[in-house]
Amino acid sequence: MGQSVVVLGAQWGDEGKGKIVDLLTEEIGAVVRFQGGHNAGHTLVINGKKTVLHLIPSGILRDDALCLIGNGVVISPAALIKEVSELEDAGVEVRSRLKISPAAPLIMPYHIALDQAREKAAGGKAIGTTGRGIGPAYEDKVARRGIRIADLHYPPQLEELLRTALDYHNFVLTKYLGVEAVDFQKTYDEALAFGDYVQPMKSDVAGILHDLRKQGKRVLFEGAQGALLDIDHGTYPYVTSSNTTVGGALAGTGVGADAIDYVLGIAKAYATRVGGGPFPTELDDEVGQGIRDRGAEYGASTGRPRRCGWMDIVALKRAVAINGISGLCITKLDVLDGMEKLKVCIAYEYRGKRTEYAPLDAQGWEECTPVYLEFPGWTENTHGITEWDKLPVAARAYLRALEELAGCPISIVSTGPDRDHTMVLQDPFA
């Protein structure tokens, strides 16, 4: 507990982080995004009104919250402009409260072209990216040919960087992937225009965070995707292109390890996954379809149906361990209402042996067969319940079992999409 809290996904993403971030941003100094791009879709429902954010921190709907985008985030100019415009049209003040690190890399048109052409060429072996250029933008960052926010304000340098990048990427696009080249002049002009647009928002995010900590202000670090999609610790190669784990909050903003006081891991009461990759507890039957329908399990960014399955404690314990999770938030408990029985994977059968540890590669995960523990379901309606004692006995027993099996206390339970459909058992900021 303390003044700086990291909120991150403890599964494969889509756990409901946006709502929880919004809930915790009352009396907040700042909310900061530290990795990913506009492939994240954070859905907020406040008083019945739905808002989907892809790039801007979820705290933007709090009038007094400062919203920061750190150096670890890759920024699509078009996506940022669109999101700012939509929020401002809805009466939300954005540009005076949004601060963006000059070290944040840009997603350029050639990154999008590469992403989409590669996925198409891969066919059945595609990773299942959103096709929005996230991965190629991170590739350029590591290869030191990326274009960052800071570069937009030095036209001669920008021109040189862009020509070098296009010489490389257009060769790959035309000669290897067989698609059209990206035009230099159009890309250059658009980049310059975005430089003018973003200039008032360009700020030293790390410096702001250090100052806020000195002032004793609350800061919330908002993760995107989930721990099991981490480029290093996830089901590689079926992962995202950034560090979605707690280390990403440090490297992606410029703060030290002592700046983090509490790590809140978000997990659904069951499990979902989008795109390719191993998913040991996946349900390819009417039970899985029922969960998908009741939980509206379709991507906020892409609309793709999510794969659904039982809670996987082996995977959850891995997320708890690699992130040093202080407390869990279990979301979508109400989706399980009316189910006669529930299953929880407590171990895997892997190459003839039982193990409680997940393999470190996708092929190993594919070979795992879940070992289940069965729990009674409940017929009562839990939707919108905000008091622990009012939950059905079976629901409370299920949550306590998850807590014990994961070896981590449950701090928050969500029983519906609205901000108010939540019970806080332990305030991370208390």
Curated annotation (Swiss-Prot):
Its cofactor is Mg(2+). It is an enzyme of class 6 (ligase). Mg(2+) binds at residues 14, 41. Keywords: Cytoplasm, GTP-binding, Ligase, Magnesium, Metal-binding, Nucleotide-binding, Purine biosynthesis. Binds 1 Mg(2+) ion per subunit. The active site is at 14 (proton acceptor), 42 (proton donor). Homodimer. Plays an important role in the de novo pathway of purine nucleotide biosynthesis. Catalyzes the first committed step in the biosynthesis of AMP from IMP. This is Adenylosuccinate synthetase. It comes from Xanthomonas oryzae pv. oryzae (strain PXO99A). The gene is purA.
